[in-house]
Structure formats: structure tokens, C-alpha cells
């Protein structure tokens, strides 16, 4: 996925990317199922729960240039980092994505809920990070 802002989920990254595996009907349920359109807490819980069903084996996320507001469709402010992030931990990818949006990982509900489910680590200080130039 391209790391970016999302109006309801705040962040589109590894965790939300798994919504691409669902049917249109399921996607609509995620957005409307609480009875309130695009309820952030309900959507975040659905996304975290979906990742319990099938956690990604590897996420390669594009953080070269991305929208930081009014996403995902825009128009909105852009940020250029020229980075690609890869990990077997989708929570870590999205925790990093949160920092790209100048947010604390725990403030992104999908990250926090997935962390609480035991799907990965949101504390970036606990992770081994390797950087490569290409």
C-alpha cells in the first residue's frame, strides 16, 4: 500500500490494506455497520479483527510521497520522504506510518486495536530497524 491519510481510519497502511481482500458488501458493512457512516471506532475494530483472520506475511509500503490530509482521494497536502518500508509486522508498519502523519501510533485506532489483539508491536523503540540506500 501507499501510506496515506484516510478520513475515517486516519491511516491507510498495512492493516487497512487487508480490506482489499473483502467483498464490496463487507466493505460497506465496515463503513456503515455501526449505524453511523464511517464511525472511526467501528471501522478500526473491523480492520483490526480482519487482520486476526488473516495477518499479512509481509507488507511493503510506499512512503515515497503521500497525502497527509483529506485522504485518501484528496486533494490534500503532500509529504515526500522517499522511503519504502517493509516488515512482517503490519502493526509496526502502521506505527511508522502514524509518525509519517505526525501522529503517535497509539492515537491511530487501527494500530492500537491491532496491538491490543497481539498482532504486532506499535512501540517503534522496541524494533530493530535497518536502513538501506538504493
Region roles according to the model:
Residues 1-134:
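Extended, low-polarity segments enriched in aliphatic/aromatic residues
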Amino acid at each position: 500500500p501507499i501510506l496515506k491519510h484516510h478520513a475515517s481510519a486516519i491511516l491507510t497502511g498495512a492493516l487497512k490494506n487487508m480490506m482489499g481482500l473483502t467483498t464490496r458488501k463487507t466493505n460497506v458493512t465496515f463503513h456503515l455497520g455501526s449505524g453511523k457512516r464511517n464511525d472511526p471506532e467501528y471501522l478500526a475494530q473491523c480492520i483490526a479483527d480482519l487482520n486476526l483472520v488473516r495477518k499479512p506475511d509481509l507488507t511493503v509500503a510506499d512512503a515515497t510521497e503521500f497525502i497527509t490530509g483529506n485522504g485518501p482521494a484528496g486533494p490534500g497536502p503532500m509529504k515526500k520522504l522517499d522511503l519504502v518500508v517493509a516488515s512482517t509486522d503490519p502493526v509496526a508498519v502502521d506505527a511508522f506510518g502514524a509518525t509519517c502523519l505526525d501522529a503517535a501510533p497509539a492515537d491511530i485506532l487501527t494500530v492500537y486495536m491491532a496491538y491490543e489483539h497481539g498482532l504486532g508491536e506499535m512501540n517503534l523503540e522496541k524494533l530493530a530497524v535497518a536502513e538501506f540506500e538504493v
